[in-house]
């Protein structure tokens, strides 16, 4: 599904990734681990197409396509999802409108008609129950006034509704208490399926137990990894 070969990346002239190699197959969950500054978030942002990163060498292929030539919205329509370490607020844009617009963008990419509004609300409410979220979240601005834990749950809700082929979760569990961590972990685990893959970006092993073995990120270069056993 995802193939990264000899990827090197700089930011403002400073080398962050140096010759990274990674293979992520369908049905796999990989944990990308390492201390602050080792390039974990850089890799996540490069995959999502965030500007400001210079690729000096290497290739990235996703579903057989050259990912690096695609715009961020094209990557998203192909089923690549990034869960942010620090989810941004979007005042004036309701959660339900964002979710519906995102779902319909993916459906258009697949040649499907727009989702029925009634069925869509039923789907979203089902996923919200899994995330222990009240219906009132739908009418609120995206992450506007949300606590840290609510923002992280909202990120996972987006993933549950969109059902991406590949989700890259950048320290989604960071700063959560034990109860919120259990809810977020349940949401992530509910998406495990043979046709999907997950990469969890973490500093420590404690939150990466769903991936085996972890992939450790060293000073600019990650060590090799192997596919985890089936869930």
Residue positions per predicted region:
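The feature captures the beta-strand-to-loop junction immediately N-terminal to the Walker
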Residues: 33-35
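ABC ATPase NBD Q-loop/coupling interface
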Residues: 59-75, 143
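ABC-family P-loop ATPase nucleotide-binding domains
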Residues: 88-158, 162
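Walker B catalytic motif
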Residues: 171-172
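Helical segment within the ABC ATPase nucleotide-binding domain
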Residues: 181-194
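H-loop/switch region of ABC-family ATPase nucleotide-binding domains
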Residues: 203-204
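H-loop (His-switch) and adjacent beta-strand-loop-beta switch element
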Residues: 214-229
């Amino acid at each position: 599904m995802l193939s990264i070969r000899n990827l090197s990346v700089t930011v403002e002239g400073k080398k962050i990734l140096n010759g990274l190699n990674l293979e992520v197959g369908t049905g796999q969950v990989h944990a990308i681990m390492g201390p602050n500054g080792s390039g974990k978030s850089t890799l996540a942002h490069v995959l999502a197409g965030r500007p400001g990163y210079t690729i000096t060498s290497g290739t990235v292929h996703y579903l057989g396509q050259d990912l690096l030539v695609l715009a961020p919205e094209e990557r998203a329509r192909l089923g690549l999802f990034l869960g942010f370490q620090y989810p941004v607020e979007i005042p004036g844009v309701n959660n339900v409108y964002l979710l519906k617009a995102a779902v319909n963008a993916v459906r258009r990419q697949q040649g499907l008609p727009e989702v029925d509004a009634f069925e869509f609300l039923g789907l979203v409410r089902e996923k919200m129950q899994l995330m222990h979220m009240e219906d009132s979240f739908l009418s609120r601005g995206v992450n506007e006034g949300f606590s840290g834990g609510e923002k992280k749950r909202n990120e996972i809700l987006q993933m549950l509704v969109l059902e991406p082929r590949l989700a890259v979760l950048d320290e989604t569990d960071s700063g959560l208490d034990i109860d919120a961590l259990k809810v977020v972990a349940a949401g992530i685990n509910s998406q495990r399926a043979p046709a999907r893959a997950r990469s969890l970006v973490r500093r420590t092993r404690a939150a990466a137990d769903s991936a085996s073995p972890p992939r450790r990120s060293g000073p600019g270069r990650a060590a090799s990894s192997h596919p985890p056993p089936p869930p």
